[in-house]
Amino acid sequence: MTSTTITPHHIGGAWTRTERRRLASVVGAIVILHVLGVALYLGYSGNPAAAGGLAGSGVLAYVLGVRHAFDADHIAAIDDTTRLMLLRGRRPVGVGFFFAMGHSTVVVVLALVVALGASALTTTELEGVQEIGGLVATVVAVTFLSIVAGLNSVVLRNLLCLSRQVRAGSDITGDLESRLSERGLFTRLLGNRWRGLVRSSWHMYPVGLLMGLGLETASEVTLLTLTASAATGGTLSIAAVLSLPLLFAAGMSTFDTADSLFMTRAYSWSYQDPQRRLNFNIATTGATVVIGLFVAGIYVCALLAHLPMFAALSPIGDISENFEFLGYAVAAAFILTWTGALLFNHLKPQRN
């Protein structure tokens, strides 16, 4: 049976030549996205009026992509997969990148469809499609997040039990490996089969693709609106209009990749010592439970607010329109947790 034990030297040591090549490929692909997005705009710079309007929309599309990278669901998916791959003794390089690429595929394809059909579809028809997609995505999100929070609550309880054993002087190294390997929805449901499925960073592409089908966030809806507006103007070709979703993808992939690399570094550092690893995972698992329940609760309020008897929940449900800000808070919390643990680790020997 394949062991899930991590080799600290491999995970915490210098990057191998293969890992550096993979990282260079990821960075190169992100650069190409930026170049394509800008080049499609520059190709129409001969028309000052049209190019000027597209430039403003392009900057906004890029910023929307950056905002979307900090969505709470992005951070949760990337964090969980990064941890899983490290448990398998592999240092992931492109988890965030391939997740963003899967997500971006949906955005680019739908933006193309919107651009091609902008003149044929009415505003009412577009709003109807958006409403149905948003409802389905919300139900899926509530179900997924509730299950994740429930499973992680069990793991958190087990980790707290291990912490009490440590304080009592017990050796928990083997138990810690077992408890941490239970984390994550698919790991708990599929067991070792999930570990066989997630072998490389590129396996996050279909995950990002599926999670992008809802297109329920304000960033994506705004991008599609920009695309439709540019297409209906009649002054730009489809190729030029596609610069908007490409710039959106460039911004999102840049920061999703940065997030996965940071979490790889943070978890690699924590895995070098069992006690450090236990404390770090208690903090991050607890945060996952709280965030999952909070987001699911907001989505439930948003659904119920459509019913007359629950109209008072509308202000709470409206929070779902600003989940990017929650993503910023989650990212900041993980950074502060890692920084605090790092400082504590440096100060601890001095106290002893």
Swiss-Prot record:
Subcellular localization, as worded in the UniProt entry: Cell membrane
GO terms of biological process kind: cobalt ion transport
Keyword set, alphabetical order: Cell membrane, Cobalt, Cobalt transport, Ion transport, Membrane, Nickel, Nickel transport, Transmembrane, Transmembrane helix, Transport
Pfam families with a match to the protein in the record: NicO (PF03824)
Origin: domain of life: Bacteria
GO cellular component: plasma membrane
Entry membrane topology: Multi-pass membrane protein
GO MF term set: nickel cation transmembrane transporter activity
Residues passing through the membrane, by range: 23-43, 46-66, 95-115, 131-151, 206-226, 230-250, 290-310, 323-343
Keyword Transport listed: yes
PANTHER family for this protein: HIGH-AFFINITY NICKEL TRANSPORT PROTEIN NIC1
Function: Mediates energy-dependent uptake of cobalt ions into the cell. Can also transport nickel ions, but cobalt is the preferred substrate.
Record-given protein name: Cobalt transport protein NhlF
